[in-house]
């Protein structure tokens, strides 16, 4: 169980240094660090908050889902010259991918961590506009969406998904959908650095050297030309949460979804338009889908149509028209 210490926020800041940040895929924080703008990438901290044992209770406030570094006055929820303007990695729906963060040797607070993808593109787009800083309400709405779109440990077959040794059964933190660090006071392989058991300086921090923390996640059945992968680490030792984002592209989700539509007819109803007929698919290839708002075409996603989709019976789909699909 977690011991209670009466300690002021000012004392905490004076005595505890170095923490952690997302490194793979390259987070906005990592890119800021590599550009020489962020002098302490492991220091984007949401504090003081109730981080434990209820790991989802705290509001993200100014930090938002992508983090705010008060040391350098950088808000990563808004794209800058060196981050957020374009994707840094391309995934395919259903991929199993390795993700990694870096914990500082002088700030390994133990606890639990998670990853998420928000599938509300309209909301995510607010974090992709270099001319707009999301409000705190929008930041919290996005974080709620990331929690809803959690990429669970158990989504990856064969991955060990244990309960935190610093959390007791019946506590809110007693869950194994999140990833856990090792016991905070373990004699060896302690805390988050014990997850990989890597060498000191296996990743870069600015305080005392870093240790990698590596896991695997499954990319959801979702397609986006530019979205966000959010990393969140809740500290066990301190009232702190660390939030970071990376900017991926996700391809291929719509192909799977369309196959489900054809086979099961489980999508919406629009009697005017039907898949494979009114849309005029002309064979295998990539088609570009558009959504029209007030007569202006807004790109929605790419559709990878293969032969297994084409000969199926046509079914109606809501919200699309003949002009919404163009062959590239």
Swiss-Prot record:
Cofactor stoichiometry and binding remark: Binds 1 copper ion per subunit.
Q: Name one GO biological process term.
A: polysaccharide catabolic process
Cysteines engaged in disulfide bonds, as pairs: 40-43, 66-245, 102-203, 118-145, 153-161, 167-173, 181-192
Q: Which residues bind Cu(2+)?
A: 19, 109, 242
* Reactions the enzyme catalyzes: starch + reduced acceptor + O2 = D-glucono-1,5-lactone-terminated malto-oligosaccharides + short-chain malto-oligosaccharides + acceptor + H2O
**Gene Ontology cellular-component annotations:** extracellular region
GO molecular function per UniProt: metal ion binding; oxidoreductase activity
Superkingdom in the source lineage: Eukaryota
Signal peptide coordinates: 1-18
What this protein is reported to do is described as:
Lytic polysaccharide monooxygenase involved in breakdown of granular resistant starch.
Name by which UniProt lists this protein: Lytic polysaccharide monooxygenase aasB
Q: What organism does this protein naturally occur in?
A: Emericella nidulans (strain FGSC A4 / ATCC 38163 / CBS 112.46 / NRRL 194 / M139)
């Amino acid at each position: 169980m977690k011991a209670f210490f009466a300690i002021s926020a000012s004392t905490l800041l004076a005595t505890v240094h170095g923490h952690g940040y997302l490194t793979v895929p390259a987070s906005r924080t990592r890119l800021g660090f590599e550009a020489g703008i962020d002098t302490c990438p492991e220091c984007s901290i949401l504090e003081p908050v109730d981080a434990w044992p209820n790991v989802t209770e705290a509001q993200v406030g100014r930090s938002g889902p992508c983090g705010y570094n008060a040391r350098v006055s950088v808000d990563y929820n808004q794209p800058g010259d060196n981050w957020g303007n374009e994707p840094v990695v391309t995934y395919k729906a259903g991929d199993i991918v390795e993700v990694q963060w870096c914990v500082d040797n002088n700030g390994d607070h133990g606890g639990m961590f998670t990853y998420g993808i928000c599938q509300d593109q309209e909301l995510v787009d607010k974090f992709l506009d270099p001319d707009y800083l999301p409000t705190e309400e929008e930041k919290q709405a996005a974080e709620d969406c990331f929690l809803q779109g959690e990429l669970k440990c158990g989504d990856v077959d064969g991955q060990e998904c244990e309960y935190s040794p610093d959390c007791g059964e019946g506590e809110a933190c007693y869950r194994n959908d999140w990833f856990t660090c090792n016991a905070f006071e373990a004699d060896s392989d302690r805390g988050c650095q014990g997850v990989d058991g890597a060498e000191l300086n296996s990743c870069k921090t600015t305080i005392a050297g870093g240790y990698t923390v590596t896991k695997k996640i499954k990319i959801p059945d979702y397609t986006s030309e530019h979205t966000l992968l959010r990393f969140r680490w809740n500290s066990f030792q301190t009232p702190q949460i660390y939030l970071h984002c990376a900017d991926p592209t996700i391809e291929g989700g719509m192909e799977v979804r369309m196959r489900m539509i054809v086979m099961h007819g489980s999508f919406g109803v629009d009697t005017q338009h039907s898949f494979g007929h009114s849309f005029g698919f002309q064979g295998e290839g990539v088609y570009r889908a558009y959504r029209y708002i007030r007569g202006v075409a807004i790109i929605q996603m790419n559709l990878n149509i293969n032969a297994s989709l084409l000969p199926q019976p046509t079914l109606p789909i809501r919200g699309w028209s003949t002009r919404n699909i163009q062959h590239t």
